[in-house]
Amino acid sequence: MANYHRIDTCNVTDGPGCRAVIWFSGCPFHCKGCFSPQTWHPKSGQLYDKQAREEMIKALEEPYCAGLTLLGGEPLAPYNIAEAYDLAVEAKKLGKTVWCYTGNTYEHIQDLDIMKYIDVLVDGPFIISKFNSNLKWRGSANQRVIDVQASLAAGTVVLHPDSNTVDKFYPEKAYDPCADMTPGEIKAKYLDIYE
């Protein structure tokens, strides 16, 4: 059973729209400059149990949720892939998109069963000497934002059409759960946990 570090039920930075995101524990790459080195050890964080799975599924069922993003650590590591696969299958059943960030390259993992459920793969290790804060959805220039289904069909890597543009929000794909709420209702529903 996998471990994970964090679940975010409405993340807007790791793929388009509001996304259910999980940071799996364990990573064999240990990239210099990694933004989440606390996830490197496979037994760090907490056990990905039935409750964690239910939290992710519930987040994916929300109408404002555009999809699932698998992060880490390394979501495709042998000790994480069964849980990552399960979440990807559930997300697709709900009509959601699936994004996955991996230190592997597409060519190395293209034959994994999970790939038929992944829409977009951000591949390759983070290389600090190739860091560029202007890149969309990735941190270093060697990483690629790949349209997985188009790549599988073409037999070669097909980049996501929006991978080299400046980051933007996708209002046509997102639902604002607070649009019809008063500031008091928003505070009561979402912010009281901080008081």
Q: What are the residue ranges of the model-derived segments?
A:
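P-loop/Walker A phosphate-binding loop and immediately adjacent motor/lid segment at beta-alpha junctions
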Residues: L76-A84, A88-K92, F131-M181
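Cysteine-centered iron-sulfur cluster-binding motifs in ferredoxin-type domains/subunits
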Residues: R19-C34, E74
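N-terminal [4Fe-4S]-dependent radical SAM core
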Residues: M1-W23, S36-K43, V157, D162-N164, ...
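Short, conserved loop/helix-junction motifs that constitute active-site signature segments
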Residues: D113-K116, G139
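Receiver (REC) domain switch/active-site residues of two-component response regulators
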Residues: D119
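Short, acidic/turn-prone active-site loops that include or flank metal/cofactor-
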Residues: P125-I128
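Conserved Radical SAM active-site core
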Residues: A2-R6, C18, S36-C100, Y106-I114
